[in-house]
């Protein structure tokens, strides 16, 4: 799905925590084992790995120490909402700027040289104030500015760029953007560098882009334009959240074709995104993440184009295989 059915060359394997640990997707050891297996098969550095950190859970800091010593993740992954599926009954939500709880972790991350902190934000239902009472605030970015300013040696990568809407049509959010020029929580993220004078805040697009790339490309243009204008083109990162949605190729194709309409550029002072292989899209697709993860793109590309996975893909194509633009997910059915 990732390396054969799409144009993806390097990927990052992640996980997620839940109040009920039996729901956990992959343990930190399993993520690391996946990285080892793929890179052994390929003979190159194809797969990077997160370690998930879980503040407020028993033994969480000991797990951080263990990961630093043995797992050696490429970056960290955290969920300020605690459990991303439903309001945490265990109270595992937390803030990025909690000096007592989180700052000791930041100190360890800086000392270990694992200084990229990826944080899940946004993606709540339309009735979030009612369905996530007392918890929804932790999905916003109102805790990010101070943390980023206090820890300039850390890179804060906000997953989904804190876009609020989840599993709903982007039409209503686009209407709000057309009226106010703002996109719920994503605009807040884009304004942080100017408000706090920081350059270590990044927006990853993930599921946020997946939910609108095909269903409402105008909103996708407004979303990406907002991020590029506020964060700068050098701090917007590609992400697909695949294989949740199958091969990421359909999202790759959508981004290649995406452009901000001229009237939107003029009204909101958005830059043009340009060609698929132009400066801005190349930075989003690969260059920005490569810098964060210390990947020399020229060296890496040389190794990847001649590795075992490249050979497997060549065999696949020779046998008639093609890139997949299929999107996995639910289909809404409406009664007549």
For the regions a protein language model found, what residue spans apply to each?
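Mid-to-C-terminal alpha-helical segments outside catalytic/metal-binding sites
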Residues: 1-5, 10, 62, 74, ...
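N-terminal cationic-hydrophobic initiation segments that often serve targeting/anchoring roles
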Residues: 3, 38-42, 68, 148-149, ...
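Active-site gating/metal-coordination segments in enzymes
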Residues: 15-139
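Conserved strand-to-helix beginnings and helix N-cap segments that scaffold or border functional pockets
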Residues: 24-28, 61, 217, 221, ...
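Alpha-helical elements of Rossmann-like donor-binding domains used by nucleotide-donor carbohydrate transfer enzymes
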Residues: 33, 63-66, 104, 143-146, ...
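Short catalytic-loop micro-motif centered on adjacent basic/acidic residues
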Residues: 48-52, 157, 239
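Conserved, mostly hydrophobic/aromatic
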Residues: 67, 76, 109, 160, ...
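Catalytic pocket-lining loop regions of alpha/beta-barrel enzymes
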Residues: 90-238, 246, 263-280, 315, ...
């Amino acid at each position: 799905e990732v390396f054969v059915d799409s144009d993806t060359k390097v990927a990052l394997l992640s996980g997620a925590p839940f109040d009920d640990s039996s729901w956990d997707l992959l343990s930190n050891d399993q993520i690391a084992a996946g990285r080892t297996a793929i890179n052994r098969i390929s003979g190159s550095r194809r797969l990077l790995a997160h370690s998930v950190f879980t503040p407020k859970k028993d033994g969480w800091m000991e797990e951080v120490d263990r990961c630093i010593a043995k797992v050696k993740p490429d970056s960290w992954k955290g969920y300020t909402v605690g459990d991303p599926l439903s309001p945490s009954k265990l109270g595992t939500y937390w803030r990025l700027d909690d000096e007592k709880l989180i700052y000791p972790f930041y100190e360890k991350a800086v000392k270990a040289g694992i200084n990229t902190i990826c944080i899940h934000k946004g993606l709540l239902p339309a009735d979030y104030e009612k369905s996530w009472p007392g918890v929804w605030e932790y999905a916003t970015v109102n805790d990010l500015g101070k943390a980023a300013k206090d820890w300039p040696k850390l890179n804060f990568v906000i997953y989904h760029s804190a876009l609020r809407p989840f599993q709903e049509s982007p039409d209503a959010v686009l209407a709000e953007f057309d009226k106010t020029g703002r996109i719920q929580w994503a605009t807040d993220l884009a304004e942080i560098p100017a408000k706090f004078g920081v350059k270590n805040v990044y927006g990853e697009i993930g599921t946020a882009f997946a939910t609108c790339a095909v269903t409402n490309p105008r909103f996708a243009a407004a979303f990406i334009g907002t991020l590029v204008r506020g964060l700068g083109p050098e701090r917007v990162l590609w992400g697909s959240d695949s294989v949740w949605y199958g091969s990421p190729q359909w999202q790759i194709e959508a981004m290649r074709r995406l452009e901000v309409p001229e009237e939107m550029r003029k009204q909101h002072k958005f830059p043009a995104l340009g060609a698929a292989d132009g400066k801005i899209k190349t930075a989003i697709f690969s260059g920005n993440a490569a810098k964060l993860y210390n990947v020399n793109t020229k060296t890496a590309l040389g190794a990847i184009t001649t590795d075992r996975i490249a050979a497997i893909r060549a065999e696949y194509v020779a046998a008639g295989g093609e890139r997949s633009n299929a999107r996995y997910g639910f289909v809404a059915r409406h009664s007549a």
